[in-house]
């Protein structure tokens, strides 16, 4: 994490419960059943068996949620956030892909690598826990700078791109794409982490980052391309990119391209 309000990377009162039975897709609409075709790719991938240093293997909940967020991006290539996340590699002082020395050739490949890096970022920033708030030992309680959610982002990051405040406003009124059931899974959270700090829109940002992990993920995708310096583990390159996880996202993209009807089901979630 980066700055005074970041959470410790591992120790917490939150626990990802082990091996719970798989639940059906998070909507009673029977037409959404085939979203399991997307999440099953993640759950059965080599990425699901790949350890990220001391953080271990990614939990089922994060794999399912990130699979659906990535699928949404693939289904909406002209959306503002997808275009930024998949744009050509830029300046290494701002762009995480350039900072890592990566040069994916196509927009598809750049999007896959960004989501793979986000998986490594979540490992370091929150141990893949959606509900992480500010470090309880930190004295700073400003709504502008207190970090929240999977990727420990703070509201003062919004100046990185005009797309970010627009994304925030969109998700405030439309929770489709949160994929909260998938991301949250069996994770339980302490009151200390669920608390939001300060006043104004920064409090709403903290709350939305926790309660709507899909928002936090799309926001982080833009941040990685526009202001990677916000994140200490990215700056230090301790957030890892695992080839098995990049391949997992590629396999999801290929599945969607072979079955475009999945995009219609995603749009209802």
Predicted regions and their residues:
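Active-site or metal-binding loop neighborhoods of secreted/extracellular toxin and effector enzymes
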Residues: 203-269
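Peptidoglycan-targeting cell-wall enzymes and recognition modules
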Residues: 31-223
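Cys/His-rich zinc-coordinating "finger/knuckle" motifs
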Residues: 12, 54, 252
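Short, low-complexity, disordered segments immediately C-terminal to signal peptides
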Residues: 9-24
């Amino acid at each position: 994490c980066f700055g005074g309000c970041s959470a410790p990377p591992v120790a917490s009162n939150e626990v990802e419960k082990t091996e719970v039975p798989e639940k059906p897709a998070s909507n009673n609409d029977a037409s959404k059943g085939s979203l399991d075709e997307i999440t099953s790719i993640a759950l059965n991938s080599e990425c699901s068996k790949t350890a990220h240093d001391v953080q271990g293997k990614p939990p089922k909940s994060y794999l399912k949620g990130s699979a659906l967020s990535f699928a949404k991006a693939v289904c909406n290539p002209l959306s503002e956030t997808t275009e930024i996340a998949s744009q050509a590699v830029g300046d290494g002082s701002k762009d995480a892909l350039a900072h890592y020395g990566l040069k994916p050739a196509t927009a598809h490949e750049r999007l896959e690598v960004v989501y793979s890096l986000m998986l490594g970022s979540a490992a370091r920033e929150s141990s893949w826990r959606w509900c992480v708030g500010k470090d309880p030992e930190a004295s700073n309680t400003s709504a502008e700078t207190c970090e929240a959610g999977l990727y420990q982002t703070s509201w003062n990051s919004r100046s990185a791109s005009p797309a970010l405040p627009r994304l925030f406003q969109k998700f405030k009124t439309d929770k489709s794409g949160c994929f909260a059931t998938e991301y949250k899974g069996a994770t339980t959270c302490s009151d200390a982490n669920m608390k939001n700090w300060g006043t104004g829109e920064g409090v709403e940002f903290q709350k939305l980052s926790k309660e709507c992990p899909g928002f936090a993920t799309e926001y982080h995708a833009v941040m990685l391309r526009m202001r990677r310096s916000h994140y200490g583990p990215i700056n230090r390159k301790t957030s890892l990119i695992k080839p098995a996880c990049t391949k997992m996202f590629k396999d999801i993209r290929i599945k969607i391209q072979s079955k475009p009807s999945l995009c219609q089901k995603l749009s209802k979630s």
